[in-house]
């Protein structure tokens, strides 16, 4: 069981309350080589690093006593005023259970959210939350708010994931921690 190793990592890093973030992904952890340049088979899923840093800054300002944990592989972007988490993905799942919430793209944190019983904000790029998302999360995309409109979706539009950082922060603040999580979207 990973609960003890997660607690040890949090204690070692002097972390109390925390929010988890994941703004890039698409690389398998299995067989990962840190010396490889970061590549992603679907880069339109990733949130722009410039905007991601703004989200981090806003979260730090709003939640001053809370650590921001960046859940990425070593060759993926890192953000100022966060701590990089180097734990195995199964430990990230365990860690998510006690997080204050998360902000992520369509990657492992959002997929762990139902079984970890945790809601968060998910920024969608070239994938559909109606296929891969969960209704307990705040699902956001540039062309639409938290309601899906298939007529506005084009998977090759590079603006899809360019959601304003302030909108992400506002939606994070609206997460209802008492609402049960779902198994899939509507």
Model features per residue range: what roles?
Residues 12-13, 62, 98, 178:
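Alpha-helix C-cap/termination motif
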Residues 23, 86, 125, 142-145:
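Active-site donor-binding loop signature of nucleotide-sugar glycosyltransferases
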Residues 32-126, 137:
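Donor-binding and catalytic core of enzymes assembling or modifying cell-surface/extracellular glycoconjugates
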């Amino acid at each position: 069981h990973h609960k003890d190793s997660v607690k040890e990592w949090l204690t070692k890093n002097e972390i109390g309350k925390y929010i988890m973030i994941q703004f890039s992904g698409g690389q398998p952890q299995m067989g990962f080589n840190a010396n490889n340049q970061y590549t992603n088979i679907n880069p339109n899923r990733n949130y722009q690093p410039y905007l991601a840093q703004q989200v981090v800054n806003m979260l730090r300002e709003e939640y001053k006593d809370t650590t921001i944990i960046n859940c990425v592989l070593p060759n993926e972007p890192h953000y100022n005023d966060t701590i990089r988490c180097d734990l195995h993905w199964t430990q990230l799942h365990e860690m998510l259970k006690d997080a204050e919430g998360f902000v992520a793209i369509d990657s492992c944190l959002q997929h762990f959210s139902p079984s970890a019983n945790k809601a968060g904000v998910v920024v969608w790029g070239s994938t559909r939350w109606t296929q891969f998302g969960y209704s307990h999360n705040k699902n956001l995309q540039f062309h639409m708010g938290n309601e899906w409109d298939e007529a506005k979706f084009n998977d090759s539009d590079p603006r899809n994931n360019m959601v304003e950082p302030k909108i992400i922060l506002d939606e994070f603040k609206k997460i209802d921690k008492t609402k049960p999580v779902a198994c899939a979207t509507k």
